Each structure stands twice: as structure tokens, then as C-alpha cells.
From Swiss-Prot:
It is found in: Secreted. Belongs to the conotoxin D superfamily. Contains 5 disulfide bonds. Probable neurotoxin. Its main location: secreted. GO terms for molecular function: toxin activity. It comes from Conus litteratus. Keywords: Disulfide bond, Neurotoxin, Secreted, Signal, Toxin. This is Conotoxin Lt28.2. Residues 1-21 form the signal peptide. Residues 22-40 form a propeptide.
Amino acid sequence: MPKLEMMLLVLLILPLCYIDAVGPPPPWNMEDEIIEHWQKLHCHEISDPTPWILCSPEPLCGGKGCCAQEVCDCSGPVCTCPPCL
């Protein structure tokens, strides 16, 4: 087998081994990206964002969005907002 053919064969087989070892890519979830983008635009950023990411200085409210800091309950590990009226 000539050198060029051998090289092409190796280049064809190599990516298949890499894909099998890594596995398929995770499914893309557009809803999570939209929520994350909305939170970056509207939610109040402070030094430790993990518990306060749902709290905002503005009176915003929503399921996975954020709500005003006055009504945001951050007593547990995750902040919760009251239901929208």
C-alpha cells in the first residue's frame, strides 16, 4: 500500500476512535441559554452570585427569572421568589 493511501486511511480511522472515546456531544438546550442570558442582563450581580442569582434590585418576577431583593427568600441553599401576581 503506498504511503499516501496509508496516511489517508489513518486520517479516516483516527477521528472515529476519538468520537467513540469522548462520546456524543450533550444535547443543546436553547431554553437554558435564554434563561442564562436573561439573568445576565437583568439579575443583580454581587460578589457571591450562587445564592443571590435570582434576586434583582428591580421588581422583576418569573419562574426561573429573578425577583426583587425585598421579597427574595435566600434562607436556604437556593433563593426562591414568590409567585407573580
